[in-house]
UniProtKB/Swiss-Prot annotation:
This is Proteasome activator complex subunit 4A. The keyword Cytoplasm applies. It comes from Danio rerio. Homodimer. Interacts with the 20S and 26S proteasomes. Belongs to the BLM10 family. One of its GO terms (molecular function) is peptidase activator activity.
């Protein structure tokens, strides 16, 4: 096949679309594709060579993507590589406009999508340009200031782009990336997220094994150990998981994951966030940062297989542990994740298996033999996931996920999966009362249909179920239950498509050598006829119940409801599928039945009639000759008979019989055209008779008939969709139909029967047009010219006939011709439309009716608009006709889209992902070929814009601005479609639209004005004329929009118009992307383009450009960049002009200011006139304008920032670093090392003089130096090399002078500050980053020039304790501190002399409204700053934050502010942290709750730096361990005493020292707050330290769920809940268990009780880590069993609950010894009760014997409760044992009763199944127990 292709083409294509080979006109395609490809290569190459990015390059890259859509990758490898390289160069042009970048990127992704086509030898792409692109866009420094506008989609596109280029990065890339990003890995900083994000995206994982040393081996150990040691799910952990999943999947068999597998599964289980235990608090961050299931699934499926089988064991454990969560009665927000896991995992395993066994080998590394999945592996996998999937079938989220999972599992192991589904399906079909069961099981059956019908050696008995299923599904065709009906239709259609319905029962006698199964199938196939007839009867019943008269009044609704139309669709498609698959004999019987039904009664034409007509159409479509013989003569004679009567033709209400026959006729003619030719005379007669009926319904049916006849004759389409090529045959000696059950279509043996219009048919079509269309056109023409006046109804009738004639025959009519519209755009590259051949050779000798209709319709439109503008129906019709004249060639785009979607849905529901290679059923393959034909038919890209189109579009525009809104609306939609089709027509149309908005014109009506605005707004999917991304377009539309505010037809009273302007402004702001002013193409692109122009096969056409042209191209490129600058400046000037017009309404002033703010860019400064305007607007009356101005001025200041010189230094040359590194060895460690100590804050070495300041090497960014040092560190050059500070006014440029003058003006400043200290929205205001940026910019660009003026204001504001003045001064101060980054020492010193008193004052005035603002202020001021530069600030904040002056509240606020500053500094201020801790420790016994909480939070931040990460040095910041020691010492009084700890302190500070115990309790409360806040924040939990506090917490935590407890107890409870969820390392487990063991011996039963709840959560959240440690499991088991015999009843019961939980998640198993242990306990003899004398004291203490007996009973009951949804083999016996204790003393009796009632509750649903597991005797006892009187007692 390939060979022939390459000989015809002249090259061997990379991968073309095979479906093209099956089209009826395939011979013409090779020449066509070669011609187009040559054009693309030639013109794309030239466009780049002539440096014409727009329109040339953009236009021809679009052509290339269309080419790929039509032909696939039909070019040779050499071209492929050149295309990729060229596009890579284009995407990475630094100044390229983002919208173009995206368009190139999408094409590049398509080119790289099939990575098997290009290997690493063929192609290598550098990684750095992509990194720079990503960095420039994602971490843009100017976007937040409004200097860059990026579209929201850009992030996703870049991600996919990098993913596609990743396999081709050079082998040195990994090391380079690590050097680049490793220094960013500082876990306390946002850069950690950045580094991990880049690692996840960029690190290549597909290197061949011999290069692994240069690939993942460089980073795997570091990153996996980091992942293993992080305990609290920071947001970057998700990136690691995705990276590991990809690594595992790309290198199966090359990495030993075994040591990590328990950890991996533990973390996966944790990230499902399942609820465990009774009272659970989830740490919120576990929810937000949970793993993405799609990565988890890839990771798991890559771990399966291999020699150790460990992953499968853990996976089974995982599913065993969570199976019960899938039960339909459970529901919660976690359910979606579980379902996703179920749905994706089988798909992922199937994908892997396909890669191992069926995929054609490619250059990618194959999986080594040792790690391939064996048959046993697959069976184990299916077994482990089967149970949850079967439970999930009936889930609350619907059965779709389960159905998809089953579809994939059935491919792997049909014999394991299908039988249980069948067991659920048969009963569901029998019951009538549970329809949801039926819908669920049927949708699952549809998924496994192919596996079932095909049978195969694994599941040979599969096909036997086919007939029983079909027969039992029939009752589902139920008129009363819509969803049941639809799923039944889908079910029947799916199964019947797979099977030819032929009766082969006689083959049993005539053929020998049939197997047993084949014999059974043959005899069963006798039922098929019965099935088809029954189905037809059911359909008739359905139709009878849904006639219009029965359901609603005739007048209300003529149309079908939405539901009915769905049923109609389901009915007709299922029926036609069944008939297609029938043998001729069965068909004949069905045909007679349908014919009788249709002709013996008369149906109304709206609901029932449509359904019946659909069924009749299905019969004629299947076998046209046989069916037409019955239907056509019948209908024709009936119609002629009735219509012979003259009056009938003029009746308003037609005879029902006539209507019905007409409807039936119009549907049955939808068959192959050649069959209709036999009846041509009758059909013509009927058409002539009925087309001019008076009744509208009548003539519309006649039009439909005409349309269907023409379409059948003129289109190309497949004649049949049967599942076997050549139609369904009877069995013969050599052929047995049952062997074709479930057979996929063979792509190269489809034998599609095409209908291609023959000459006769074409003749007949044109005969009909001459006969019927011509007279109507003449009639309309006369009407227009005023010769003959016709009524409106007649015009409408004529238009209807014209439209239907055109729709039917349009594929034979050539497109409209005309002169191209000149001078829209001048480029040097040709842009021409691609003509795609679609099987029709136009006959130019005939009349071109497309042109004729066009010539008649335009004058008619004119006439209608002038004389009868209210004839809306005719206008609607004309709009439709214009739309079709422009675009229609046989199919509509929206119909094509829905068909494409439904094709994909069906393909998904029936595909075989395991074998791949297009093994779809034949009908689907034919459908796909047909879609390919339609796709070619609809390809309209880049059409030339001709004068005809111009005229029609102008007509549409006229309609879009006409009087009636409905007409406008429809015309606008057609207009938008047209605008998207023709090249550059928008440029032609914009001026015309804008004329309506011209304020000079007085003749524009309000409707026209609105219409024009709507035309500019566009619809949601199409083009928005107001915002085309070109300077020439915006320069016209934006000023025009603003000026339209003065138009006489504009009124702000009309809400609809105001809303339109709002929508326009909103859309422009949403969609605007920065438009480039630089359109240059770099040399590197041109080189590749020249190579492409030299390539051969096919030769590029046209060839390379001459030198002359190249020079011209360069000149144009320069000119274009100049033009862009001028247009930009002109647009800004125009907008400013509009603003200076005094009459402009306020609304439009705001609109203009919005537009102006979009004009800020980072590569061109704003013209100074606009700068002046924005600075003046800072004091505008309107708040909205002031806010825009603040943002804009902040942006302008960024534009004016003079660049500070940076020098690249090797870090090891810095003097401070040299001195600290005596030894030359550079360690790999991160964290606090000798070589980064000089970066840290050290009060003895602070720069306190000019000389120190100059010598000190400041490093501003906090992350440098924590991890490894970068190769090159960028530092600021010394002060003398920086731009001059303190410029005089003369040295400034014009823009700077404007700002300088205003801010030096006392009045301006006073007014400005007054506005800033007003309240905007009461109680909603926050610290504003925009204002901060403004002040930062002022102080950065102008040093301290404005301080003298601002100083009095700041002093005044600080003294005012109201919220707004305080916020205003906070914004100024943070801007000041950050803006002073580069000031000289003397200025900085003066600044702090001013600021320190101000801040002290502010902090003493702090209030509940302002403390957050001050916190933000200080945090913002300290962000990314060297702490040594801010030492004044830190020293001031450290002055006794907790003084008690001003009350507890001020203390808490000061701490908050201080914490904000220190947290930003992370690891660089250990000294300050130590000082703070020392200062706080004595104060931990605070009385006030708010201060305690704040101290807790501060402690979290103090200890944040003490992390336990791999390769990290112990920190020099405070450490938790030492702190815990000191705290425990102070808590002694509490830990030693045995009595209950009560919180009996009244909250008031009494003088004099209280006793130690009270102090200890106060201390404990603060410690609790610290434990709570640190649970979710730090990276690693300090388990050993927390363990020492555990005994104390267990003592306090309350047992009952009671809210009335005091703060201390609830806090303790919360702490325990959070600690128990913590992730444990395997070495910490023994420590925890021994601590728990110790506490379990304590005398307080509260502690013993709480241990159990703690244990439940801890074990579940670390399930696999525990399971991998056998000793730990034994210890837990022993602990629980011991507490089961506790003397306290509550503890015993809790132990039983815990035990049943452990059994349920398979942590422990029910084995013989355990069962025996419980039985022997439960048989403990109780001492006889003595008869007590009356009045004697009842002994209440339970004897030890009773406790043991109860423990045994509890143990048995735990076993029973541990399997709530099924009955394991051991259960009946245990139930019998339990029942023996029903009459024991309390508390035993209660336990037994409760257990039995629970058992009854949980097993009630499926009792029929469960009953099977018991013997008859046991059942008797059980029934007796569950319903016996004692049950009610």
């Amino acid at each position: 096949m390939k060979k022939e292709a390459s000989e015809l083409l002249g090259f061997s294509p990379q991968k073309d679309i095979v479906y093209n080979e099956l089209l009826p006109y395939k011979d013409k395609l090779d020449d066509e594709s070669n011609e187009i490809l040559a054009q693309i290569k030639g013109n794309l190459g030239r466009a780049v060579q002539l440096r014409e990015v727009w329109p040339g390059v953009l236009f021809w890259t679009r052509k290339l993507s269309t080419y790929i859509r039509l032909y696939g990758r039909k070019f040779n490898k050499e071209d492929h590589v050149l295309f990729v390289k060229l596009l890579y160069e284009l995407v990475t042009i630094p100044k390229l406009e983002i919208s173009m970048m995206q368009s190139f990127a999408r094409l590049l992704i398509t080119l790289l999508k099939k990575k098997e086509l290009l290997s690493r030898e063929d192609l290598e792409l550098p990684w750095r340009p992509l990194y720079e692109l990503q960095d420039r866009i994602l971490y843009s420094k100017t976007e937040h200031l409004g200097l860059n506008w990026f579209p929201s989609s850009v992030e996703a596109v870049l991600k996919v782009l990098i993913k596609s280029c990743r396999p081709y990065f050079p082998e040195s890339a990994t090391q380079e990336m690590l050097d680049e990003w490793k220094p960013l890995m500082c876990p306390f900083d946002v850069t950690m997220q950045k580094a991990m994000g880049y690692f996840e995206l960029f690190l290549p994982t597909t290197l061949p094994p011999e290069l692994h040393d240069k690939g993942f081996k460089l980073w795997f150990d570091d990153l996996i150990s980091l992942w293993v040691s992080v305990q609290n799910l920071p947001s970057w952990e998700v990136n690691l998981v995705s990276l590991f999943a990809r690594l595992a999947n790309d290198n199966i068999g090359y990495i030993d994951w075994d040591p990590y597998i328990p950890k991996i599964f533990t973390r996966i289980l944790r990230s499902l966030n399942l609820p465990v235990g009774s009272s659970q608090m989830l740490v919120s961050r576990y929810l937000t940062n949970a793993y993405d299931i799609s990565y988890v699934v890839i990771w798991i499926s890559a771990l399966l297989g291999g020699p150790s089988k460990q992953a499968q064991t853990q996976l089974s454990g995982l599913f065993n542990g969570i199976t019960s969560f899938f039960h339909p009665s459970n529901h919660g927000r976690w359910l979606m994740k579980l379902m996703k896991l179920l749905q994706r995992l089988p798909a992922s395993v199937v994908k892997r298996l396909h890669r191992e066994r069926y995929r054609t080998p490619t250059w990618l590394t194959p999986i080594p033999e040792s790690h391939l999945l064996s048959e046993q592996d697959i069976t184990d996998f299916v077994e482990s996931i089967k149970q949850p999937v079967l439970l999930a079938m009936f889930s609350k989220t619907g059965s779709l996920d389960a159905a998809q999972a089953l579809q994939n599992l059935a491919l792997l192991r049909p014999e394991l999966v299908i039988p249980p589904v069948l067991e659920k399906t048969y009963p569901a079909m029998e019951t009538l009362i549970e329809p949801h069961q039926l819908t669920a099981t049927l949708s699952c059956m549809i998924g496994v249909a192919r596996s079932l019908v095909a049978g195969g050696q694994r599941f040979p008995e599969g096909p036997k179920h086919m007939l029983p299923l079909l027969m039992r599904a029939l009752p589902g065709v139920d008129p009363n239950d819509f969803s049941k009906c639809m799923i039944t239709f889908q079910f029947l259609a799916t199964f019947v498509t797979l099977v030819p319905l032929v009766d082969c029962s006689s083959a049993i006698h005539s053929r020998n050598g049939l197997t047993q199964v084949e014999k059974e199938l043959c005899s069963a196939s006798a039922e098929f006829e019965h099935f088809v007839l029954q189905f037809v009867d059911r359909c008739f019943a359905l139709i009878d119940t849904s006639t219009l008269e029965q359901t609603r009044e005739e007048m209300e609704m003529e149309k079908m409801t939405h539901l009915e139309s769905l049923v109609e669709l389901g009915l007709s498609s299922t029926f036609s599928t069944i008939l297609t698959q029938c043998s001729m004999e069965i068909f004949q019987v069905a045909l007679d039945k349908v014919f009788n039904f249709a002709t013996t009664s008369i149906f109304e034409t709206h609901v029932a009639g449509r359904m019946v007509a659909d069924m009749c159409r299905a019969t004629t479509k299947c076998h046209p000759a046989e069916a037409l013989k019955l239907f056509l003569p019948h209908c024709c004679s009936a119609i002629l008979q009735i219509a012979a009567n003259e009056e009938v033709l003029n009746e308003e209400e037609l005879d029902k019989e006539l209507m019905w026959n007409l409807q039936l006729l119009s549907e049955v003619v939808r068959v192959d055209g050649d069959q209709l030719l036999l009846y041509r005379s009758q059909l013509v007669q009927i058409l002539q008779l009925t087309l001019h009926l008076k009744c509208k319904q009548g003539y519309s049916l006649a039009c439909k008939l005409l349309y269907h006849i023409l379409r059948s004759m003129s289109l190309i389409y497949p004649r049949e969709y049967c599942s076997i090529p050549g139609g369904i045959q009877q069995h013969t000696d050599t052929y047995l139909p049952i062997q074709d059950w479930g057979r996929p279509g063979e792509l190269w043996n489809l034998e599609i029967q095409w209908h291609v219009p023959s000459t006769e048919e074409t003749e007949f079509v044109f005969y009909l047009l001459d006969l019927l269309l011509k007279p109507e056109l003449q009639r309309l023409q006369k009407h227009t010219e005023g010769q003959q006046d016709i009524s409106r109804d007649d015009v409408l009738q004529s238009l209807s006939i014209v439209h239907n004639c055109f729709l039917g025959a349009s594929s034979l009519l050539p497109p409209l011709h005309g002169e191209p519209v000149p001078q829209l755009i001048n480029g040097m590259v040709q842009l021409y439309e691609t003509k795609v051949y679609t099987g029709v050779d136009y006959d130019m000798s005939r009349e071109n009716y497309r042109e004729d209709i066009c010539k008649v319709i335009r004058p008619l439109l004119n006439h209608t608009l002038e004389h009868s503008e209210d004839d809306i129906k005719s206008l609607f019709s004309i709009i439709k006709i214009i739309n079709d004249l422009l675009h229609f060639k046989g199919s509509h785009k929206n119909e094509f889209d829905t068909r494409w979607k439904s094709f994909n849905l069906i393909k998904k529901s029936m595909e075989n992902r395991l074998h791949g290679s297009k093994q779809h059923i034949r009908a689907l393959l034919i459908d796909r070929v047909m879609l390919q034909h339609e796709l070619r038919n609809l390809t309209m890209e880049g059409c030339s814009y001709r004068s005809v189109h111009q005229d029609l579009i102008n007509d549409l525009l006229r309609l879009s601005t006409s009087r009636y809104s409905q007409v406008r609306c429809r015309a606008q939609n057609v207009l938008f479609t047209a605008l998207g089709t023709y090249n550059f027509c928008c440029r032609d149309i914009i001026p015309v639209v804008l004329k309506y908005l011209d304020p000079e014109r007085t003749d524009v009506t309000q409707q026209q004005f609105k219409g024009a605005l709507y035309c500019l707004l566009g619809n949601h999917s199409g083009i928005c004329l107001a915002n085309l991304q070109y300077w020439d377009c915006i320069a016209l539309t934006w000023p025009a929009l603003v000026r339209s505010g003065m138009s006489p037809s504009m009124s702000l009273e009309k809400t609809s118009i105001v809303r339109l302007f709002d929508d326009l402004a909103d859309k422009i702001h949403r969609q605007y992307e920065t438009i480039s002013v630089n359109f240059s193409i770099p040399e590197s692109c041109v080189e590749i383009a020249v190579k492409m122009l030299k390539s051969s096969s096919p030769e590029p056409n046209p060839g390379a450009a001459s030198e002359q042209e190249e020079l011209e191209g360069r000149k144009r490129e320069e000119q274009k960049n100049k033009d862009a600058m001028q247009k930009y400046e002109k647009l800004v000037a125009d907008l400013l002009d509009c603003l200076h017009d005094r009459n402009i309404p306020w609304k439009f002033e705001q609109l203009t200011i919005g537009f102006l703010s979009l004009m800020l860019r980072d590569d061109l400064p704003l013209p100074s006139s606009a700068v002046l305007f924005f600075v003046e607007s800072l004091n505008h009356d309107s708040l909205l304008v002031r806010n825009v101005a603040i943002s804009a001025v902040a942006g302008i200041l960024k534009q004016l920032k003079r660049p500070h010189k940076k020098v690249a230094v090797s870090p090891y040359d810095i003097s401070e670093l040299k001195t600290s590194l005596q030894s030359p060895v550079v360690s790999l460690l991160t964290g606090d090392r000798p070589d980064n100590q000089w970066l840290q804050y050290d009060s003895s070495r602070l720069p306190r003089s000019q000389r120190d300041w100059d010598e000190c090497c400041f490093i501003e960014k906090t992350h440098w130096g924590y991890s490894t040092w970068p190769r090159k560190l960028m530092l600021y050059a010394p002060l003398e090399e920086q731009p001059k500070q303190g410029q005089t006014r003369e040295e400034m440029n014009e823009r700077e002078q404007i700002i300088y003058d205003h801010f030096s003006d006392q009045l301006f400043i006073d007014q400005f500050i007054q506005y800033l200290s007003l309240e905007d929205r009461k109680g909603k205001d926050k610290f504003s980053p925009r204002r901060f940026c403004l002040f930062k910019g002022l102080f950065r660009n102008f040093d301290d020039a404005f301080l003298p003026l601002l100083k009095p204001h700041m002093e005044r504001l600080v003294a005012d304790s109201h919220e707004s003045p305080q916020r205003c001064v906070a914004e100024i101060i943070s801007g000041l501190i950050r803006g002073s980054k580069h000031w000289s020492y003397s200025k900085v010193e003066k600044l702090w002399a001013l600021l320190c008193p101000l801040l002290r004052k502010a902090l003493s005035n702090i209030t509940i409204e302002t403390y957050i603002d001050w916190g933000t202020c200080i945090a913002t001021a300290c962000e990314s700053r060297d702490p040594r530069k801010l030492h004044w600030l830190f020293e001031m904040l450290m002055e006794s934050p907790v003084t008690g002056e001003g009350g507890s509240f001020v203390d808490a606020c000061r701490l908050y502010v201080l914490q904000g500053g220190l947290a930003q500094q992370e690891w660089r201020v250990p000294e300050l942290l130590h000082r703070l801790l020392q200062y706080l420790e004595p104060k931990l016994t605070q009385v006030y709750k708010n201060v305690r909480e704040r101290i807790g939070s501060v402690l979290t931040y103090i200890f944040m730096i003490d992390v336990d990460l791999p390769y990290t040095q112990p920190t020099t910041s405070p450490r938790i361990r030492e702190f815990t020691e000191r705290v425990l010492a102070r808590l002694k009084p509490l830990t030693e005493g045995e009595e209950e700890i009560q919180n009996h302190i009244v909250e008031e500070n009494m003088e004099g020292d209280q006793d130690e115990r009270t102090q200890a309790i106060k201390l404990l409360k603060t410690v609790l707050k610290w434990l709570m806040t640190s649970a979710g924040r730090s990276f690693s939990s300090s388990v050993p330290e927390q363990l020492r506090l555990l005994p104390l917490l267990f003592k306090i935590a309350p047992v009952e769920n009671d809210d009335s407890y005091d703060e201390m107890k609830t806090d303790a409870k919360t702490c325990l809940s959070l600690m128990s969820q913590g992730l444990l390392y395997s070495d910490q487990i023994p420590q925890v268990l021994s601590a728990l063991e110790e506490i379990s011996r304590s005398s307080s039963w509260h502690a013993r009780y709480t241990i159990l709840t703690y244990l439940q959560i801890m074990v579940f959240y670390n399930l696999f880590t525990f399971l991998s440690d056998a000793k730990a499991v034994c210890d837990v088991r022993a602990l629980v069993l011991r507490l089961l015999e506790d003397e306290q009843l509550e503890v015993r019961e809790m132990a039983a609950t815990t035990l049943s939980g452990f059994l349920q998640c398979n942590f422990l198993s029910i084995d013989e010894p355990m069962q025996a242990h419980f039985e022997s306990l439960s048989k403990t003899r109780l001492p006889k009760r003595k008869r007590r004398e009356l009045g004697s004291v009842v002994d209440t203490i339970p004897s030890a014997d009773l406790v043991r007996r109860h423990a045994g009973v509890l143990g048995l009951s735990a076993c029973i409760l541990s399997s709530p949804y099924d009955v394991p083999t051991w259960m009946p016996q245990i139930l019998m044992d339990l029942s023996a204790h029903l009459n024991d003393t309390q508390p035993i009796e209660m336990t037994v009763k409760k257990t039995l009632s629970d058992f009854r509750r949980t097993h009630h649903d499926n009792w029929q199944e469960h009953k099977q597991k018991f013997t008859d005797d046991q059942l008797l006892v059980l029934t007796d127990l569950l319903v016996s009187p004692c049950y009610y007692a």
